[in-house]
Amino acid sequence: MSDDHSIHSHTQGLHHIKKKRVGKACDSCRIKKTKCDGKKPCNRCTLDNKICVFTEKKKTKEKKHPSGYVELLEARLDILTRSLEKLIELSRPHLQFIDDIITEEKSVDQEKSSPASSTPNSSSSDHHDDVEEQNSTGVVAPINKVVSYLIKEQGLLKNIPLEWEQGTEIAANFDPNRNLKSSSRLFAEHKGEAFIGSPVTSPQQMPTSNPFRRTSMFKEELESPSSDHYNESIFSQSVDEPYIKKEPNSAQFSKGTFSPQQQQLQQQQQMLNQFSLNTSRDISDIESDSSNKEDGLNSGSVSPPTSNYRSFSLFSDSNGEPILGKTSSLTSLTNKYENHSLSSPQTAINPVFNNSTTGPILTTLRRNSSSHSQKTLGSIQLQQKPRGSVHKPVRNHSRVSSFDKRMESTATAAATVAAVSGSVQLSQNTTPQNLPHLDNSQNNNYLRDNGMNNIGAGSVGGGLTFGAPSFTQPLSPSDDAIVYPTNQFTNRPATVSTFGGGLDVLVDNSLDPFFNI
């Protein structure tokens, strides 16, 4: 029982470990609302091949200071201020800029104190409080002027962030006896801007070039009288827009780019004398959609307007003749074929014999044209008739009407091959019993005339041999029968069924199993 209890407690411990919650899930698991293991990167982002990011939200919490902390800072600030004033007073004989600042400050205070007593009450309460504080305190030590001089001239706060520069300027010019309320309001506004994230620069480091001035200069350039004439800055297009070569036909020409539909409207409105890209002929969809770099479509050059100027347009030359580019339309290709009568060449039906022993025995037999091509040519010729073109009759060759004529022509060709070059051989066992229609006496006379003496029923494996074979390509194992050239010996061709397929015909030392002659 004790062992079972320990195992049960151990499994419960593992179960509690597995159910441990993760403090924070990654962004991907948070969006998908799936469980995240909290690792960096987590297992699910690793399997999905994604970047695992844990976004931390910054919560603005006010600092909790202990009691008396603010009073302590105020006392410390007062001590540091008095110490700095004492140091400035002691270093005045040694530093010339301190003497100049103190002298200037005294003169300014004297000028402000004299008209302040005679002026009426100010409308602003802040200004009234500052004047009262100034009259009561008198001349203040020029500590703020010294700090401002060190910041601007000596680079006291050179490495601070840019957004804190205005805040330091406000703090440097702060005087609790003069501008307490105004300085506090300005610093609070600056703190809110810095918290949002908008950088605020100081007046001495504001950029000299104003972006609004650039816009106004560009507007003045567009509205200037010279904008009526040629100006590259006006006609220059952006990178995203297509570049079109603009060549004027007169002093007044359009300044924009037109679509093919607008170009057709511009042709109809010739009274406006606006430049049109298509004045010579209608263009097809392929020509209008294609980009011809050779024709100058991608060049942004613009020619200046001249009087009586006739230039090359995109689709015609100076004489107005159309220019056919590389991307000509399919309609022009069809018209080109329709204007010419096409007919298939007359193919050879019967083999041509040659008596020379060195040259080729048979000429190349061309295959008959397909019915599809003949129908296509016929449809083209039917389209030629209403157009008044000269009609030429198609010379269609005659086809072999029966299988017997093909057999006779093939046997005649094979007999000629055997008579001239002696290149016919039966490669299988052939006996006189397998050849009932073969006359041995005639075969002997035939072989004796050709200078062959090796004849017999069992000379080569018990078969009948006629010379050495000279086939460049072996016979197909699918042959069912071979035509034996016996037209000179008998009145009909002899067929020896020694192979296992169809009938092959030798054409230029190559086998054609489809009887394409």
Curated annotation (Swiss-Prot):
Residues 26-52 bind DNA. Residues 250-260, 298-307 have a biased composition (Polar residues). Keywords: DNA-binding, Metal-binding, Nucleus, Transcription, Transcription regulation, Zinc. Its main location: nucleus. GO terms for biological process: regulation of DNA-templated transcription. Signal peptide: none annotated. Residues 113-124, 261-270 have a biased composition (Low complexity). It is found in: Nucleus. GO terms for cellular component: nucleus. PANTHER family: QUINIC ACID UTILIZATION ACTIVATOR, ZN(II)2CYS6 TRANSCRIPTION FACTOR (EUROFUNG). Transcription factor that acts as a negative regulator of fluconazole resistance in C.albicans. Also confers fluconazole resistance in S.cerevisiae by activation of the PDR5 gene. This is Fluconazole resistance protein 1.
